[in-house]
Each structure stands twice: as structure tokens, then as C-alpha cells.
Amino acid sequence: VPAPDTWPDAHAALSALKVAEDRYSYIEPAATYDAFFYEGRSLGFGITYQVEADALALRLVQPLSPAHAAGLRRGDRIVAIEGRPLADILAADALAEAFGPTEAGAALEFDVRNDDGLRRVRIARDWYDLSYVIGPGVHDVGGRRVGYVNFYSFGRLGLTPWQTALDRLLAQGAQDLVVDLRENGGGLVAIAAQVGSAL
């Protein structure tokens, strides 16, 4: 393995060290990492998506994000970016390039399809406050009261909204609890341990 100082930058070093199957290693500036995990803020559009053959299916839209303010919701599909069809972007392996610069104010036009049809919306990246707990509620399932909560991140500020949601679900008569961690990217082990100990 070449010495670290033989690469022009950290991104080049990571690219050289990664194997093709590695989808998880990445480099992030310390400022955005600290903002996300310690300050409860993020910079971006505020979407989590699944890549399909010709679209990005939105799995989660942060409630206080630019994307949510522009009307995007879970289940919507982005079918074009800046007028370029997603199928073409994906075929060229150019998704990261299509999303462009990551700084605040960088804007893109998205063609978004949902049950209401197709529309074009322009969204600028910006800082927004994270919602750690999304969509808590109690549902009647098989004669039991089942609480549901989507817990987004084990960030430092996530414990209070988690406890508030848990108290609310119990007050509404929840007998069972579903904790949705599908979009949870991890975080601080101490927070995860405290969340787990509450169950």
C-alpha cells in the first residue's frame, strides 16, 4: 500500500483503498458531521431515496427540510434532474455528478411524479433542523394497540424527542411498539444504548 502522502487528497486515497463492493466508506467534512450528530442540523435537500431503474423513489423526506417545503413527500419519484431523465443519468453512472455541488444555495430542478401526476420543482440545498422522530402514532392491529415510530438517527439531540414520542404513545394506550430504523444511519453508541434500554 502506498504511503498516505502519495495521494493528492483524501478522496483519492479512499478511492484507491476501497474495493468495488464497498458501498459504505465515504469522506465527510468534520463541520457537516458534527452538525448532524451533535447539533441536530443537516445541509442538503432532506431526502432519502432508493434507486430504481428510471427514478429515485423517496423513502423519507425530513419534515423541516427544503424538499418538504417544496412539497416532496415519501413515495414521490424523481424521474429527471435538470431535465435529464434519471434512466440516462443512471445508465451513465452519473448520479453524484447530477446532484452537483453540495454547498448551501446550490439549486436543482427535479421532475417529480406521484399519484397527482408530474411536476417540476426547483429546490435549493440549505441547512435545516433534523426531525429525529417521524410519524409517531398508534394503530389497531389484530385487536391490539400498536405504536409506531420512525427513529431517524442516534444523534446527541435525539434522546429527548424519542422519550417524548414514547410517552405519547404509551399515553395513547400502545401495547406493542414498532421502532422503524430503516432510514437510521447510526450515530452515537451511547444514545443507541439509551434508546434500547427504554424498550
Indicate where each model-derived feature is located.
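Flexible, low-complexity junctional segments that flank or bridge functional domains
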Residues: 1-177, 183-185, 190-198
